[in-house]
Amino acid sequence: MIKRVHLGQGKAEEILNLPNLIEIQLNSYEKFLQLERLKNNKPLLNEGLESVFRDVFPMKSSNGEVALEYEKYYIEYDSISFTEKECKRKGQSYEAVLKIRLNLQFLTTGEIRQKDVYMGTIPLMTDRGTFIVNGAERVIVSQIHRSPGVVFYKEKDLYYARIIPYRGSWLEFEIDSKKDYLYVKIDRKKRILVTLFLRALGLDTREKIIETFYKIRKIEVNDDTKREITGQYLATNITIKENMTYRAGDKITLQDIEDFLQNGVKEINLIDFDGYDSVPGKHFISSDVILNCFEKEDAYFALKDGFKELSRESVMLAVYSVLLPGEPISIDNAENDLRTIFFSEKRYDLGHVGRYKLSKKFGLDDLTTSVLTMTDIVNTISHLLRIYDGHDVLDDIDHLGNRRVRSVGELLTNIYKGAMSRVEKIAKDRMSNKEVFNLKPQELISVKPVVSAVKEFFATSQLSQFMDQVNPLAELTHKRRLNALGPGGLSRDRAGFEVRDVHYTHYGRMCPIETPEGPNIGLIVSLATYSKVNDYGFLETPYRKVIDGKVTDDIEYLSAIDEEKKCIAQANASVSSDGNYTDDLVSVRISGDYTTMMPKNIDYMDVSPRQLISVSSALIPFLEHNDANRALMGSNMQRQAVPLLFPQPPIVGTGMERIVAKDSGVVIKAKRPGRVVLATNKKIVIKPDNATSERDLDEYELYKYERTNQDTSFNHSVLVKNGQIVNKDEIIADGPATRYGELALGNNLLVGFIPWNGFNYEDAILISERIVKEDLYTSIHIKEFSIEVRETKLGPEKVTADIPNVSGKILSKLDENGIVRIGTYVKPGDILIGKVTPKSEGDITPEFKLLTSIFGEKAKDVKNNSLKVPHGTEGTVIDVQRITKDDVGNLPPGVDEILKVYIAKKRKLKEGDKMAGRHGNKGVVAKILPVEDMPYLADGTPLDICLNPLGVPSRMNIGQLMESQLGLAGKYLGEYYDVPVFESATNECIQEKLKKAGFNETSKAVLYDGYTGEPFENEVMVGVIYMLKLHHLVDDKMHARSTGPYSLVSQQPLGGKAQFGGQRLGEMEVWALEAYGAAHTLQELLTVKSDDMSGRVKIYENIVKGIPTNVSGIPESFNVLMQELRGLGFDLSIYDDNGNQIPLTEKEEELINKT
């Protein structure tokens, strides 16, 4: 184990330890399946899978005679046929059978029939937070989406309020500020006037609507109050004579007041616009928008003053013509329909999140109602109008209080909900159709919808992704990723700048640095180090509580909503040992504003300086000295580092390396404390201290050179010896890219920042041959090749070494069964598995039968269908797997056997490989110099790597220089350092270490040229830098083609390495050749070397025969163009110089020959 020296400005020990870094996956799945509760026989909570079954059952038949009730579900662990390792080997899924106990109750007789019904299989999560589906490890990425609830926002001149449910119709209100009208939209259909909508929902008179939204005041009518009343609006109807009614919402004129006085009206109710805030708990409004809507109604229905209220029929017709245009309606049905859209639990569900958001917004205590209520609608309209009047503020859509996270458990719950609603439909049909009394519970339940939905989700959903397994950090980051894309999320094309941008609420919740470059920037992000997801799906981050200016050790997790308007101090504010701030003014932030405050006004304090960034970014030392763009590249490139054969932990680390290795799941940790009984390269056996018997031992199986998803090698190496005492959770075996239990993605190299003969121009890298010789950057890559042995119409295919027309030399690498021997070195074109397929046999002559019986298969008509090593691949065969029906029970239809061959290749560092540091400083190896030619220090030590100093100033990633300086001191002092982000070692501290190591405090030294032995003119910055080899290897990119496949229609060569394609000669290349007047070169490039079919064959013949050649026919693309024109109805033919027609198709050729 490495002892690290803490070189930070803060304390070495953290206030709060980091949570388990993959708990977002583990906790979410546990909440969904509740496996712990199932194992311990505890009652299940109403969440996840349990809530799905409770929602669907009980089911009752339409006649009410039969009910199907749910009791419980359980997982059959005995049904797990394979271990995780076997699943990967055999291409199977790691899953268990799910069963539910149902009671079929006959309500007329009281009889109950009980049965455990099979509900398909359910994939189980491994303890690393992954799933194994069809032999490949997959991760379900958490989705960040718009939270259900209500949002208020503005676009152009329109003010909007939108109520978004978890499931159901969207309700949207909008105010057109030019016209002062308020409209409502249901499911983004046409607009309806809000007063009509309110009438349809039960506020059917003007009086009721006014009473709901406005404060009303009474006023006496007399000559003194005339002036005050004139121009005001009535709040209640006033009837003077039988045919003369003044309606609520009408404007009062002097003439009206005269009428009131004449007819003995002493007191009237007026709308009090100014008293909107005078009643606590009531959201009254001061706007006349609703009154304008009354006027609009009058105009729409041509109502005259003194006319009565709108009839129920005309309201429902107006509303319904928008909801279901062109449908005949009955008024009662229409009214019921409208109410069920929002008020029925079957069709509408706010979700507990939506209800929480609504209640929080409007200050209500209700947290249980899952449907909308009239109060919600009224509150929403009032709030929107108050915003319009400037009494309230708009919401920020990108605030993390309005976005929430859906992890595995919730995504699966939704899949099961959808599937179970289909199951319910089928079951109800069967209940009403069949002979009821002969029914059994299992006959009612159709399991197909469930099985197919789960299968589809894991295999094809945008959120179920092939795990990024290049190295442990890539795995870990993939599990902690938040994706805004996917079903129910955003789409790349429609996502604007605002959604992608960093928001102040991301602090401590989402990393502002780590996100992909390119079209997904800002849509795919990473969880911050301390961040957790709460029960509502909102991201929370921990803070220390500050009471009366004193910092306590109480930790409180706050969501973005709770954090609003709180005053929060930074983690590195100076605090005395008793918890008091040492400064009179402390730097704080309040809702995105940065300012200073007196200690007594502070509410909370950050837990750690690294709480605002992600795990990848927290691995970059001196992060605060880098430009953010380069830090982003650094974070992303660490995930692409290939696991090396001999990695070293970084001399300059950040303290996160150990935590990442431990939580990524690639190392092996001791489950219980004890003593090592056996430690071999295959397994470790530990006898626990609290063993219950002699046989109670902990066995750990080690992975040896297993292939990962990205073809890198997964290999464990033992860290313990026989007889060693180990503690609980101690690391007993290293995994890929870990060393001594720490993440080790690369190696420490002696670097000089110096240009060298132009070989490190433009980010190119010059390295020493020592690095290649000592295998510092050698990695192992394992490829899998598979072949299926099928049953064909003409008989089965065979795996055999008896292959027709193949020389004995080629077959020498196969064993007697036709399978390549393990340990063989194979090259492109070699046969890995000999396979023959029967050809169709015509009538066999007696002579042929005789030959067959003498010579066996060779003479028989079979086709060679062997598996060969593809181009560009070579290496050693390390394993061969044969999977038959007996092994796995089910192979795809028509397949008898699957054979897999694994080929491993040791790849040394070579020119063209991409390397990078941790600060976004990437480059391609341009030259590998002999050690004696490398520049060397005064004591004769040659450099390992030369980087161009011009790569630093414009990129502004100074972190690499500070890392190099401290690394140099560490190398010569034999120390390893922890330099936590945002509280790194100071310049003085680094200079002190350099002096101690005997270097100049600037770490500049005189370098000598390896060619001439002369010193360079100026001193050169020398240091030790941590460099990684990235997954972009030149061997995977190099590609050449002589002859290969052609596209079917255009007959031009395919493109790309995967298709063994050619190099496209595009229009610009054609222009270049035209500019040179290279007519013959151009002609052959555009015809015989591309798509002139007859010319291709002829030229090949001529080359073989050695005849000088000058062939050219008609390129196929010309024929394609001709046929397209003919398809448009042009009758076209082509003729040569002599006037003879040239045929374009075989049919044409026949016709011409006839004539």
Swiss-Prot record:
Coiled coil (UniProt feature): none
UniProt keyword terms in alphabetical order: DNA-directed RNA polymerase, Nucleotidyltransferase, Transcription, Transferase
Cellular component GO terms, alphabetical: DNA-directed RNA polymerase complex
N-terminal signal peptide: none
Superkingdom as given in the UniProt entry: Bacteria
Enzyme Commission code: 2.7.7.6
Record-linked InterPro entries: DNA-dir_RNA_pol_bsu_ext_1_sf, DNA-dir_RNA_pol_bsu_external_1, DNA-dir_RNA_pol_su2, DNA-dir_RNAP_su2_dom, DNA-dir_RNAP_su2_hyb_sf, RNA_pol_bsu_bac, RNA_pol_bsu_CS, RNA_pol_bsu_protrusion
Catalytic activity: RNA(n) + a ribonucleoside 5'-triphosphate = RNA(n+1) + diphosphate
Protein name: DNA-directed RNA polymerase subunit beta
